[in-house]
Curated annotation (Swiss-Prot):
Pfam families assigned to the protein according to its UniProt record, in alphabetical order: DHQ_synthase (PF01761), DHQS_C (PF24621)
InterPro entries, A to Z: Dehydroquinate_synthase (IPR050071), DHQ_synth_AroB (IPR016037), DHQ_synth_fam (IPR030963), DHQS/DOIS_N (IPR030960), DHQS_C (IPR056179)
Pathway stated in the Swiss-Prot or TrEMBL entry: Metabolic intermediate biosynthesis; chorismate biosynthesis; chorismate from D-erythrose 4-phosphate and phosphoenolpyruvate: step 2/7
Purpose of the protein: Catalyzes the conversion of 3-deoxy-D-arabino-heptulosonate 7-phosphate (DAHP) to dehydroquinate (DHQ).
Top enzyme class: lyase
Protein name: 3-dehydroquinate synthase
Entry EC no(s): 4.2.3.4
Top-level taxonomy: Bacteria, Pseudomonadati, Pseudomonadota, Gammaproteobacteria, Enterobacterales
Named cofactor requirement(s): Co(2+); Zn(2+); NAD(+)
Catalysed reactions, semicolon-separated: 7-phospho-2-dehydro-3-deoxy-D-arabino-heptonate = 3-dehydroquinate + phosphate
Positions annotated to bind NAD(+): 71-76, 105-109, 129-130, 142, 151, 169-172
Transmembrane segments: none
Organism (species): Citrobacter koseri (strain ATCC BAA-895 / CDC 4225-83 / SGSC4696)
Record's keyword terms, sorted: Amino-acid biosynthesis, Aromatic amino acid biosynthesis, Cobalt, Cytoplasm, Lyase, Metal-binding, NAD, Nucleotide-binding, Zinc
């Protein structure tokens, strides 16, 4: 069992990583006998895990209600969020309740925002079931829903009480979802840890085979890196923005193509190549390192170009609504070397458009 602490003073919390955690009531600390819980999950995961977790918690004396939502990025909306509020109010649940997010990034983000908002804030626990959510979205307290004009535009910073990562969940993960998660894994190597990137080059096949030791190390290293960044910059005023490598481009793809048509990791993968090409054009990143990124993404089964039907110009309106924009100026996360990156403003639009167009023709 691996345990990592996200250090935020009185709001610090553990990330527990192991196989078989769903069988142990202690995995869901700080829940205890007599507590009230609302389990939030989706239609895909409910048949796989809902009864198991409900049974484990009820055996420990926890009072469990649940709400099952439709599955998919397009349901990460204010309308579906209201379904959670209605379920909480109908029971009813008070300010001493705990929300448990059982699912991937959509369920985690939406449930976290529900917890941040319901009666001005209640406790919640992240139980991520996809690789992407295990290494990224469940850690750090970013919660949100989408708006038709932009991804994650309505939300809050709100930390969980704990994160429970059961490696066994990956056994039921579709191959496309596994690849999507690997995009965020690869991101950590590009922005923060060149040695980890090299480890990924050497061990990607083991990850694709879901080999336990390799996957446990991979998830632990990603969580360690993110925990360090969040502890230093919880509200994304500086360092934490580096975690958005590829996301400014990727969010444009998701919004333009319709949420869910491209998985988040797929869009981020293409976006990371666009960021690398932009950095190349600025003379601060080598073509050889861009090729290393492309090769690793392709081995993971990820796209390295944007949608053929989306013009370079179509990206700009979305990118100019990005949350990193300051005083109307686009700010991009750009790699400087494998393992080193920066946030840079003032990049001429023609350079960005040229990089996007180059990736469209890849």
């Amino acid at each position: 069992m691996e345990r990592i602490t996200v250090t935020l003073g009185e709001r610090s919390y553990p990330i527990t990583i192991a196989a078989g955690l769903f069988n142990e009531p202690a995995s869901f600390l700080p829940l205890k006998s007599g507590d009230q819980v609302m389990l939030v999950t989706n239609e895909t995961l409910a048949p796989l895990y809902l009864d198991k977790i409900r049974s484990v918690l009820e055996q420990a004396g926890v009072n469990v209600d649940s709400v099952t939502l439709p599955d998919g990025e397009k349901y990460k909306s204010l309308t579906v969020l209201d379904t959670v509020f209605t379920a909480l109010l109908q029971k009813p649940h008070g300010r001493d309740t705990t929300l448990v997010a059982l699912g991937g990034g959509v369920i985690g983000d939406l449930t976290g925002f529900a917890a941040a908002s319901y009666q001005r804030g209640v406790r919640f626990i992240q139980v991520p079931t996809t690789l992407l959510s295990q290494v990224d979205s469940s850690v750090g307290g970013k919660t949100a829903v989408n708006h038709p004009l932009g991804k994650n535009m309505i939300g809050a910073f709100y930390q969980p009480a704990s994160v429970v990562v059961d490696l066994d969940c990956l056994k039921t993960l579709p191959a496309r979802e596994l690849a999507s998660g690997l995009a965020e894994v690869i991101k950590y190597g590009i922005i923060l840890d060149g040695e980890f990137f090299t480890w990924l080059e050497d061990n990607l096949d083991a990850l694709l085979r879901l080999e336990g030791p390799a996957m446990a190390y991979c998830i632990r290293r990603c969580c360690e890196l993110k925990a360090e960044v969040v502890a230093a910059d919880e509200r994304e005023t500086g360092l934490r923005a580096l975690l958005n490598l590829g996301h400014t481009f990727g969010h444009a793809i998701e919004a333009e193509m319709g949420y869910g048509n491209w998985l988040h990791g797929e869009a981020v993968a293409a976006g990371m190549v666009m960021a690398a090409r932009t950095s190349e054009r600025l003379g601060q990143f080598s073509a050889a390192d861009t090729q290393r990124i492309i090769t690793l993404l392709q081995r993971a089964g990820l796209p390295v170009h944007g949608p053929r039907e989306m013009s370079a110009q179509a990206y700009l309106p979305h990118m100019l609504r990005d949350k990193k924009v300051l005083a109307g100026e686009m700010r991009l996360v750009l790699p400087l070397a494998i393992g080193k990156s920066e946030v840079r403003g003032g990049v001429p639009h023609e350079i960005v458009l040229s990089a996007i167009a180059d990736c469209q023709q890849a």
